[in-house]
């Protein structure tokens, strides 16, 4: 799709760890598609893989901060300020590590297809929703959230590894990040 020089606000939600180069990459992609990025945000949410990290986020304080940011964006628009904010990140971008794994599916799967319908990259075939193409999976964990039978989850060794890693780097309350 093409932006036609439309103004845009970019968001990269992160799970109380770090958003790394996500906003920089997103802003570059938006600009390449013809959008004029005028603001960016990296709000905190519950981590998609280890839900105890960032649990309860966004909360009331986050909602107030997001509302204030929206007001600042509106004020920027009303002033006619189309400047693009500087966001953290590195060029060249980090190389993506090919991690061909995906959530596991238990016998509880009733093949309702909700996970396939909700998968943003089509890694779960509609005709075989009890399978996942690990090479296409982006590990967003949407399928685990929408499964009515809780039949999809991370494999236990992966959960243990991530819990150990994230416990070291994601403790405490991290701040939302806003860029105007």
Q: Predicted regions: what is each one?
A:
Residues 105, 110, 114-138, 142-159:
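Iron-sulfur cluster-binding cysteine motifs and their immediate structural context
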Residues 4-6, 29-38, 77, 101-108, ...:
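Solvent-exposed, well-ordered amphipathic alpha-helical segments
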Residues 81-101, 111-126:
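Short, charged low-complexity linear segments at domain edges
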Residues 1-98, 157-180:
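FMN-binding flavodoxin-like domain, especially the glycine-rich phosphate-binding loop
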């Amino acid at each position: 799709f093409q932006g036609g020089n439309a103004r845009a606000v970019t968001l990269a939600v992160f799970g109380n760890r770090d958003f790394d180069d996500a906003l920089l990459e997103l802003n570059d992609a938006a600009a390449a598609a013809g959008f004029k990025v005028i603001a960016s945000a990296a709000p905190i949410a519950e981590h998609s893989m280890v839900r105890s990290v960032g649990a309860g986020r966004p909360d009331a304080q986050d909602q107030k901060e997001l509302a204030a940011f929206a007001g600042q964006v509106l004020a920027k628009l009303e002033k006619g300020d189309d400047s693009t904010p500087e966001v953290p990140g590195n060029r060249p971008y980090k190389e993506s590590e090919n991690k061909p794994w995906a959530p596991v599916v238990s016998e509880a799967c009733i093949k309702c297809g909700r996970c396939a319908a909700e998968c943003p990259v089509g890694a779960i075939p509609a005709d075989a929703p009890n399978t996942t193409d690990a090479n296409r999976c982006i590990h967003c964990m949407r399928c685990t959230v929408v499964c009515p039978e809780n039949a999809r989850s991370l494999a236990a060794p992966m959960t243990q590894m991530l819990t150990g890693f994230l416990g070291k780097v994601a403790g405490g309350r991290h701040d939302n990040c806003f860029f105007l």
